[in-house]
């Protein structure tokens, strides 16, 4: 019997991801462009293209460009040894930061990066000289979009919000859903439904499991 899934909050805005969070697991698998700064022995078989049947050794040469998942790039990055350097994704570079500072609401964040804030926060791990600008841009983008998101969640009761939600990153979608739930709870309170006691999902699921066990 399937169990209810209780969403675990993301930890990506902090120093480390929360690997009990599905959002963080998905975010940590997004690809990041890197360049090797030293040869990497015995790793070529895993990362280099073997098409064409070319014979190569198992080392990744210095200067090789790779697409690595975020979790692996973080694990290999070391300031002291300079194992690899990271190329900032375009959406975090100066050109896009200028767009965000002009009007962050015009950008389809989900299309550009479904975990825009979480992924951007984890990029600060790589000690780029642009880190201060990136963190400032992330904060200002969130502030610039927050009011519209919450206003829409509070003024779109029983309306089709799919077009708006489709443009939000995953964290923004969570905020929108929270706003919608608050509005729905308020509407229930106004109708006098808030005083009605209902069993929690945990109790209902437990009762279903117990009934199923009795049938078996």
From Swiss-Prot:
GO biological process, one term: cellular senescence
Listed SUPFAM superfamilies: GINS helical bundle-like, PriA/YqbF domain
Subcellular location: Nucleus; Chromosome
This protein's record includes keyword Glycoprotein: no
Keyword annotations from UniProtKB, A to Z: Chromosome, DNA replication, Nucleus
Not essential for folding and stability of GINS complex, but may regulate accessibility to the central complex pore: annotated segments: 1-16
GO terms for cellular component: CMG complex; GINS complex
Domain of life, source organism: Eukaryota
Cited function: Required for correct functioning of the GINS complex, a complex that plays an essential role in the initiation of DNA replication, and progression of DNA replication forks. GINS complex is a core component of CDC45-MCM-GINS (CMG) helicase, the molecular machine that unwinds template DNA during replication, and around which the replisome is built.
Family (UniProt): Belongs to the GINS3/PSF3 family.
Name recorded for this polypeptide: DNA replication complex GINS protein PSF3
Organism: Bos taurus (Bovine)
Encoding gene (name): GINS3
